[in-house]
């Protein structure tokens, strides 16, 4: 969401957009640790410290919040926060019971963690685009700061690769190495002569899961953030007229993308527990 006015037009629109889409970076240089401008050519070995800070911080907030609510839970009339937590827990538990057909006590807590964590990271997109970055620049001297972790492909890909690792782990644990290998080589065509074709098809299908998971979440949140930034370039009266409706619509995107990421994770892990 945007709050800036005509003063943002003192820089070019492309500069403004580029500035808000650039992460705070840390990298290793010849003289030791370098930050931001010095990391332009660091390549792969660059840490997006803002994405790490906000994603870990929101994860800790989620754990602390649910822990406190669990400690203070009452059997009487619950408060609003307890109602929200109970709704999340019961909703995810029902989804797991309906969608997951194996036996694994980890799936429901994992689904809850993914949903709430991704939801909180997405929710940061509703904070005005200039509010936190401008405060960080003025008071901390930080030139770049992105506060929405899920607009960073590194974060969404990291989440998706974690899910992918669980898919492979449980596929081998439940079916054994032989069963997992057979799944990759004897489907969809159950003939030894077609093993190479089966292997290519099944490998592509398997690898496509984390790629689609990460790109779907990243693409939707990145596009939403970009629209907020474009609205921030407009006059103040246009900002209010456009940002409020877009923010209301974006709430649906925030919740829906968290739900989709959780739901697909549960479905993929359910498939990993099944024999085809």
From Swiss-Prot:
Establish whether keyword Transport is in the entry.
yes
List all membrane-crossing ranges.
47-67, 107-127, 152-172, 188-208, 226-246, 247-267
The UniProt entry's GO biological process terms, in alphabetical order, are: proton motive force-driven plasma membrane ATP synthesis
Instruction: Name the major location.
Output: membrane
Output the InterPro entries linked to this UniProt entry: ATP_syn_F0_a_bact/chloroplast, ATP_synth_F0_asu, ATP_synth_F0_asu_AS, F0_ATP_A_sf
- Presence of keyword Mitochondrion: no
* Any GO MF annotation of the entry: proton-transporting ATP synthase activity, rotational mechanism
Q: Which domain of life is it from?
A: Bacteria
Task: List the GO terms this entry assigns under cellular component, sorted alphabetically.
Answer: plasma membrane; proton-transporting ATP synthase complex
Say what the protein does: Key component of the proton channel; it plays a direct role in the translocation of protons across the membrane.
Q: Spell out the subunit comment.
A: F-type ATPases have 2 components, CF(1) - the catalytic core - and CF(0) - the membrane proton channel. CF(1) has five subunits: alpha(3), beta(3), gamma(1), delta(1), epsilon(1). CF(0) has three main subunits: a(1), b(2) and c(9-12). The alpha and beta chains form an alternating ring which encloses part of the gamma chain. CF(1) is attached to CF(0) by a central stalk formed by the gamma and epsilon chains, while a peripheral stalk is formed by the delta and b chains.
| Protein name in the entry | ATP synthase subunit a
Report which gene this protein is encoded by.
atpB
